[in-house]
Amino acid sequence: MTRRYWNINLEEMMEAGVHFGHGTRKWNPRMAPYISAKRKGIHITNLTRTARFLSEACDLVFDAASRGKQFLIVGTKNKAADSVASAAIRARCHYVNKKWLGGMSTNWSTTETRLHKFRDLRAEQKTGRFNRLPKRDAAMLKRQLSHLQTYLGGIKYMTGLPDIVIIVDQQEEYTALRECVTLGIPTICLIDTNCDPDLADISIPANDDAIASIRFILNKLVSAICEGRSSYIRNR
């Protein structure tokens, strides 16, 4: 895998608050190598190491995208949801930003069945079939469609398991991470000072609570994906 330059600026990371960790009482000792200081009861992440791992992650996703691989971005907490959706749409990735339904990847056949149902209902709505049904039946189908749109809207075009999964908050998305580990799907994970750096394939030490920090990391990753996709299209 070729190493590339991704213009990861330490000052910009500081402005985005990437370096702010959790309180010193709420930490995982395995994060010690990624912490540079304590300040007013808060752990400060070593941004040089953050930049190194973010650069590695960008190299990985660029390489994968240049070979036509598929990505899934997962981040369901309120602070991450909008950034996850906009980043995924920009890079033409799949995403989950409301709730990870248990077994979404490990029980893929069930997810696939739900996706087929979702697509069928969308098609029926577009053709106006709902309008020709009794009100009660139409209302029931609309509720089903709304529910499926909420939880599966970001993966509606997914036809198989993703090649790489990007996870915004390790603790919040622990179920998703464990499913990826079980299936051997490579993972890139933002990890705050209360996380375990050994669970993901590439762990990026960063503030996973601040919107600006989440957006900074995702922007770098999706820029690399977009470059990789352009390379893939040129070389086809």
From Swiss-Prot:
The keyword Plastid belongs to this UniProt entry's keyword annotation: yes
InterPro entries (alphabetical): Ribosomal_uS2, Ribosomal_uS2_bac/mit/plastid, Ribosomal_uS2_CS, Ribosomal_uS2_flav_dom_sf
Similarity field: Belongs to the universal ribosomal protein uS2 family.
Gene3D superfamilies linked to this entry: Glucose-6-phosphate isomerase like protein, domain 1, Helix hairpin bin
Name of the gene this protein is made from: rps2
Upper taxonomic lineage: Eukaryota, Viridiplantae, Streptophyta, Embryophyta, Tracheophyta
PANTHER family membership: 30S RIBOSOMAL PROTEIN S2 PROKARYOTIC AND ORGANELLAR, SMALL RIBOSOMAL SUBUNIT PROTEIN US2M
GO molecular function: structural constituent of ribosome
Keyword Ribosomal protein: yes
Keywords carried by this UniProt record: Chloroplast, Plastid, Ribonucleoprotein, Ribosomal protein
GO biological process: translation
Protein known as: Small ribosomal subunit protein uS2c
Localization per Swiss-Prot or TrEMBL: Plastid, Chloroplast
Cellular component annotations (GO), alphabetically ordered: chloroplast; mitochondrial small ribosomal subunit
Pfam families named in the record: Ribosomal_S2
Family annotation (NCBIfam families): rpsB_bact
